[in-house]
């Protein structure tokens, strides 16, 4: 690997081999050649003067791309598609004269992009399901484990660790639903000609529109698409790119939210992401256990959310047909969006697969604040015993402020002692201690977790079947 030129960190550090291969020059230009073969085959089968031998020769040279020839030709003609038509013709000379017959550049560029994007989305779906399976197992394990809740990042009523995980998982489920919609609604461009009129193919087939439709149907089916866009210009509608980057951005939003929560919880040592035996947290502070994976998820997710802004700007400025100035943006923003989403989900898998809960710290943190959280129940019990609700509310406020001030000086919380010593409440310390059971304050968290997981089982069953250790 050369070290004297820039290389995107998405390629060198973060993305998977699958995604790197999917958006590689080999995959892109081989897909172009597959499209040229499919076009020639359909034209031959529908009666155009193309021989089976020409089709076979094209098919025999899909993978042996001479990049040196193509690059030299592009330098001369300044056109990538025509450069590859030329290189393909050199490899398959008997078919050189019929390559790209009737087509325009977007026949190969746009249809190839749609194939790669669809395959990329399907791969990301698998990665997303894996994250959800991990979270489902984690949520089930800790469905009933109380933990301190937060609002405004201030202590609030308890929840359970599993309930918190289902909130993350619910975001990812929303992404999965959106992803399935985008994949299911993808269409092929087909053979549309320079402005989408199919005029060149109408001419080739001597006005037989049915043959043009059949040609499009056959080529689309060969690449796994059931339908083509009903109408288009030379390019497929760039709103499709917006849909794709929007769903990738949505995944990034969910991942960022989860990873940011984990970072906050790791600060208090309640939860920790995986930490390798020989991992170094800081070059200057050897004791550090930085949440590196979660930080990286947030960093890459931020990039992906920003990257998604490219697609709507492209879709909204077509100028009657796509301008070349926009094509350059797409060559960067879409592949990098896929690579970034891949990296984010791989990191999410790593974190959720080894997320560790320090249960003693979770319990200690909750019990530190539990006296304050229990005051509403204490107040209601005191009212039952004849107290005045408004007077008791004020007394609890005063005692709470005093106890908090004491805690700020490093002293333990003495709120329960203060309430036990106040005759307005008429309760002993032993009676107050009995309401300090955390599970009294988690409401229906456990039932909510289990119900949510039951809803998700149909979505996760296929992914979970690959791992017998996961009980859904």
Residue ranges, per PLM feature:
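Short beta-alpha connecting loops at secondary-structure transitions
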Residues: 20-24, 69-71, 279-299, 321-336, ...
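Active/binding-pocket-proximal capping segment
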Residues: 272, 395-401
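Glycine-rich cofactor-pocket loops
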Residues: 140-162, 272-288, 321-329, 353-373
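Alpha-helical transition-metal enzyme core signature, strongest for iron centers
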Residues: 78-81, 92, 128, 132-135, ...
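Active-site-adjacent "gating/activation" loops or surface patches in catalytic cores
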Residues: 209-234
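Long, amphipathic alpha-helical stalk/connector segments used for oligomerization, subunit docking
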Residues: 303-389, 395
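A helix-coil-helix interface module used to build multimeric assemblies
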Residues: 1-202, 207-218, 281-282, 292-296, ...
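A conserved active-site cap/scaffold subdomain adjacent to cofactor or substrate pockets
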Residues: 235-270, 274, 279-340
């Amino acid at each position: 690997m050369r070290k004297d030129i820039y290389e995107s960190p998405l390629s060198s550090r973060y993305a998977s081999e699958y995604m790197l291969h999917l958006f590689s020059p080999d995959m892109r230009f081989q897909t172009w050649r597959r499209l040229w073969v499919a076009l020639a085959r359909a034209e031959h089968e529908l009666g155009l003067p193309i021989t089976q031998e020409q089709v076979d020769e094209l098919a025999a040279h899909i993978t042996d791309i001479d990049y040196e020839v193509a690059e030299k030709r592009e330098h001369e003609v300044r056109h990538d598609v025509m450069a590859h038509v030329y290189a393909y013709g050199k490899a398959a000379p008997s078919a050189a004269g019929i390559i790209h017959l009737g087509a325009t550049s977007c026949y190969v560029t746009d249809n190839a992009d749609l194939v790669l994007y669809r395959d990329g989305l399907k791969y990301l779906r698998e990665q997303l399901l894996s994250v959800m399976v991990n979270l489902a197992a984690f949520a089930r394990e800790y469905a009933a484990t109380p933990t301190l809740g937060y609002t405004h990042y201030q202590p609030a009523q308890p929840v359970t660790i599993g309930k918190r995980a289902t909130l993350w998982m619910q975001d990812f489920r929303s992404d999965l639903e959106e992803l399935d919609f985008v994949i299911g609604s993808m269409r092929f461009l087909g053979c549309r000609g320079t402005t989408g009129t199919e005029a060149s193919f109408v001419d080739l087939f001597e006005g037989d529109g049915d043959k043009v439709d059949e040609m499009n149907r056959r080529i689309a089916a060969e690449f796994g698409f059931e339908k083509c866009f009903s109408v288009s210009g030379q390019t497929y509608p760039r709103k499709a790119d917006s849909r794709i980057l929007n769903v990738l951005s949505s995944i990034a939003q969910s991942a960022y939210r989860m990873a940011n929560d984990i970072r906050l919880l790791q600060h208090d040592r309640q939860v920790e992401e995986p930490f390798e035996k020989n991992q170094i947290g800081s070059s200057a502070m050897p004791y550090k256990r930085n949440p590196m994976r979660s930080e990286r998820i947030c960093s890459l997710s931020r990039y992906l959310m920003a990257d998604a802004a490219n697609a709507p700007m492209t879709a909204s400025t077509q100028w009657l047909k796509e301008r070349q100035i926009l094509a350059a943006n797409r060559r960067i923003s879409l592949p990098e969006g896929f690579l970034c989403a891949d990296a984010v989900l791989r990191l999410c898998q790593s974190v959720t697969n080894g997320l560790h809960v320090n249960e003693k710290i979770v319990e200690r943190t909750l019990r530190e604040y539990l006296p304050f959280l229990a005051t509403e129940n204490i107040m209601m019990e005191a009212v039952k015993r004849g107290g005045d609700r408004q007077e008791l509310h004020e007394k609890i406020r005063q005692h709470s402020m005093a106890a908090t001030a004491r805690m700020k000086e490093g002293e333990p919380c003495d709120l329960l002692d203060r309430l036990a010593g106040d005759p307005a409440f008429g309760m002993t310390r032993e009676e107050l201690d009995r309401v300090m059971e955390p599970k009294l304050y988690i409401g229906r968290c456990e039932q909510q977790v289990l119900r949510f997981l039951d809803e998700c089982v149909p979505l996760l069953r296929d992914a979970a079947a690959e791992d017998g250790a996961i009980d859904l």
